[in-house]
Amino acid sequence: MKNGRGNRVAVVGTGFVGASYAFALMNQGIADEIVLIDANENKAEGDAMDFNHGKVFAPKPADIWHGDYDDCRDADLVVICAGANQKPGETRLDLVDKNIAIFRSIVESVMASGFQGLFLVATNPVDILTYATWKFSGLPQERVIGSGTILDTARFRFLLGDYFAVAPTNVHAYIIGEHGDTELPVWSQADIGGVPIRKLVESKGEEAQKELERIFVNVRDAAYQIIEKKGATYYGIAMGLARVTRAILHHENAILTVSAYLDGPYGERDVYIGVPAVINRNGIREVIEIELDEEEKKWFHRSAATLKGVLARYFAQ
């Protein structure tokens, strides 16, 4: 165990996602201390050795070591990447039974250390497991965050930017709802340079509208395509987790589409779901309730109902 000298991030689960996330943290100089925790201690130790050998090339060398749950006591942020992976043909919701029990053990072990920081959940189905983390930890809802639709939104902006030949950073568009098959695009509020995307395609005809629909389908189904080709997705989500981590540790008050607890916004209660939220050192400062059109409202409530149906099997509502 190291002596705290700055921001500490504990990464639980050093598989593809956890190791890629730790690598992103180191390369971007986001954290001062990174502790790697895994049931396979040799894997965590090997990763720590590998990262330390590259420390001389990092913009801000962090202390990196393999540890155990006691190291979470002084952590500012615990990021859970552990759990069963999604296999070809499986949906994210198929993973619930496998991962609920794993999460109970992880979260209870973290809390037993005296941990008083924030949780960030990456494991799928992320909305369900973020809710489970909140329940198992007993922490205030704003201190438990899921990666939500941050990657879906990034995919959406990339594909729209590619279609319109503009930088994705200049595309303002959100994917909200479940990080999964019932997610939805907020076309009514999507714009490029202040010009609504719907207006941009008006003059392009029916084929342009069909292309937008194809873009969303490619966003929604991206994980299936990547899993089929290479077995797992990890680089994109690792970079998304690093972005959320920076917003937290640097107290940015950044708006990101994370899995946040709703207790009224969007007409929903008692569910974690992907929505834009203001993120800072204290966790979720507030949920941003963007205006949805009637069709988007219908699809958002359908997405929330899907998640609640799963939650009802495990938690008393």
From Swiss-Prot:
Gene Ontology terms, MF aspect: L-lactate dehydrogenase activity
Reaction equations catalysed: (S)-lactate + NAD(+) = pyruvate + NADH + H(+)
Gene3D superfamilies in the cross-refs: Lactate dehydrogenase/glycoside hydrolase, family 4, C-terminal (3.90.110.10), NAD(P)-binding Rossmann-like Domain (3.40.50.720)
GO CC terms in record: cytoplasm
Coiled-coil region list: none
Positions of post-translational Phosphotyrosine modification: Y224
The keyword Aminoacyl-tRNA synthetase belongs to this UniProt entry's keyword annotation: no
Activity regulation, short description: Allosterically activated by fructose 1,6-bisphosphate (FBP).
Alphabetical UniProt keywords: Allosteric enzyme, Cytoplasm, NAD, Oxidoreductase, Phosphoprotein
Binding site for beta-D-fructose 1,6-bisphosphate: R157, H172
First-listed, main subcellular location of the protein, grouped into a coarse class: cytoplasm
PROSITE patterns with a match to the protein in the record: L_LDH
InterPro entries (UniProt xref): L-lactate/malate_DH (IPR001557), L-lactate_DH (IPR011304), L-lactate_DH_AS (IPR018177), Lactate/malate_DH_C (IPR022383), Lactate/malate_DH_N (IPR001236), Lactate_DH/Glyco_Ohase_4_C (IPR015955), NAD(P)-bd_dom_sf (IPR036291)
Protein known as: L-lactate dehydrogenase
Originating species: Geobacillus kaustophilus (strain HTA426)
Taxonomy of the source species: Bacteria, Bacillati, Bacillota, Bacilli, Bacillales
